[in-house]
């Protein structure tokens, strides 16, 4: 590890500890030549995910692009920045869990929408309007109707599951 100040290659580790919920190791080092201290992080290097764009072009997954899009969608809502970061972390973790190293931009968009939906309706519709390229008010109305219908369906499913669980308990 080269010293960032004098480029000397020999240093000693003063302290090591887990960081980022155990996802990395933080090391405090001291250069043996200039005696200045610096911090390094060790992280697991994942095989990069390749995104297949709508035009067929391929590029490396860029977390900052997704984060920027979600932050814009969540602007002036009550969604805290930490929750946005967690949403993008969850998406990235889900992509890393896949056996395929390629994903379409459409799949990423749908994943973001699925994560935004329970989080904030306004952010969901804003993201959908850009991702699905809304051309006018009719597109917004259509998306809102679909959103409401799905919300009612989700509510009905939850009630049915609770009834089934109650029935199973009473049958025992």
From Swiss-Prot:
Q: Which cofactor does it need?
A: Zn(2+)
Query: What keywords does the record list, in alphabetical order?
Result: ATP-binding, DNA-binding, Metal-binding, Nucleotide-binding, Repressor, Transcription, Transcription regulation, Zinc, Zinc-finger
How the cofactor binds, per note?
Answer: Binds 1 zinc ion.
**Keyword Aminoacyl-tRNA synthetase recorded:** no
The record's annotation in InterPro entries points to: ATP-cone_dom (IPR005144), NrdR-like_N (IPR055173), RNR_NrdR-like (IPR003796)
Q: Where are the zinc fingers (unnamed)?
A: 3-34
What molecular function terms (GO) are annotated for this protein? ATP binding; double-stranded DNA binding; zinc ion binding
Q: Mention one GO biological process in which this protein takes part, according to its record.
A: negative regulation of DNA-templated transcription
- Which residue ranges does the record assign to the ATP-cone domain? 49-139
Biological function: Negatively regulates transcription of bacterial ribonucleotide reductase nrd genes and operons by binding to NrdR-boxes.
Q: What is this protein called?
A: Transcriptional repressor NrdR
* Higher taxonomy: Bacteria, Bacillati, Cyanobacteriota, Cyanophyceae, Gloeobacterales
């Amino acid at each position: 590890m080269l010293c960032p100040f004098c480029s000397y290659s020999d240093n000693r580790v003063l302290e090591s500890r887990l960081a980022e919920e155990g996802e990395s190791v933080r090391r405090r080092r001291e250069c043996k030549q200039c005696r200045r201290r610096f911090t390094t992080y060790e992280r697991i290097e994942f095989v990069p995910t390749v995104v297949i764009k709508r035009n067929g072009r391929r590029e490396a997954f860029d977390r900052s692009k997704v984060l920027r899009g979600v932050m814009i969608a969540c602007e002036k809502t009550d969604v805290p920045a930490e929750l946005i970061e967690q949403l993008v972390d969850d998406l990235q973790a889900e992509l890393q869990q896949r056996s395929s190293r390629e994903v379409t931009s459409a799949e990423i968009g749908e994943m973001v929408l699925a994560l935004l939906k329970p989080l904030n309706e306004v952010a969901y519709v804003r993201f959908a309007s850009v991702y699905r390229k809304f051309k006018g008010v009719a597109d917004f109305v259509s998306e809102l109707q679909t959103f409401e219908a799905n919300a009612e369906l989700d509510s009905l499913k939850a009630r049915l599951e609770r009834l089934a669980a109650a029935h199973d308990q009473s049958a025992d």
